[in-house]
Amino acid sequence: MGHPKKPRKQYDTPSHPWNADRIKEENRLANKYGLKNKKEIWKAESRVKRYRRDARIILGMDIDERADKEKELLDHLVRAGFISPNAKLEEVLDLNVEDILRRRLQSLVFKRGLSHTAKEARLFVVHGHITLNGKKINAPGHLVEKADEENIDFYPGSSVAKQFETQETEEVAAEEEPKDEE
């Protein structure tokens, strides 16, 4: 079981430390999603491996045992937003790291336009400027379920929210001025 003060690692490190292709891919992902370090990529990889392993185990079961476990896994992945609602179990084997990284709070803040860059989205989350369902979440790696995706917003009274809104209104006003001159 392990010691309560020392929980088990949630990821596996690469088997070989100096693989140029892997390092380039990890750097690309870190830049695209604004990640702090490679550990965040390795955690996502471990999650993908776990889902794919579960799918392979379920595919190998007898049909009568398989139905409940298949429905349970697919419902979990659909609720999390990793696969589409009408996906089959075989499609779970096509999951990749980017599917997991897209569901992080940090990525969704950037995608919804609440920040200019992915790194800025991380900063907003860590500094407590972002809420999810009205609750302040300060973990950029928090995986957001599909149903909660629309409930991401700035914390009420956040100074960043006020600055961001004034910048947006200034940009909209600047875009409208040339249209009036024509």
Curated annotation (Swiss-Prot):
PROSITE patterns: RIBOSOMAL_S4, S4. It holds the Pfam family S4. Coiled coil: none annotated. Residues 167-182 have a biased composition (Acidic residues). One of its GO terms (molecular function) is structural constituent of ribosome. It comes from the Archaea. One of its GO terms (cellular component) is small ribosomal subunit. CDD domains: S4. Keywords: Ribonucleoprotein, Ribosomal protein, RNA-binding, rRNA-binding. InterPro entries: Ribosomal_uS4, Ribosomal_uS4_arc, Ribosomal_uS4_CS, Ribosomal_uS4_euk/arc, Ribosomal_uS4_N, S4_RNA-bd, S4_RNA-bd_sf. GO terms for biological process: ribosomal small subunit biogenesis; translation. SUPFAM superfamilies: Alpha-L RNA-binding motif. Residues 103-170 form the S4 RNA-binding domain. Residues 1-23, 158-182 are annotated as: Disordered. Signal peptide: none annotated. The keyword Ribonucleoprotein applies. HAMAP family: Ribosomal_uS4_A. One of the primary rRNA binding proteins, it binds directly to 16S rRNA where it nucleates assembly of the body of the 30S subunit. With S5 and S12 plays an important role in translational accuracy. Part of the 30S ribosomal subunit. Contacts protein S5. The interaction surface between S4 and S5 is involved in control of translational fidelity. Belongs to the universal ribosomal protein uS4 family. This is Small ribosomal subunit protein uS4. It comes from Methanosphaera stadtmanae (strain ATCC 43021 / DSM 3091 / JCM 11832 / MCB-3). The lineage of its organism: Archaea, Methanobacteriati, Methanobacteriota, Methanomada group, Methanobacteria.
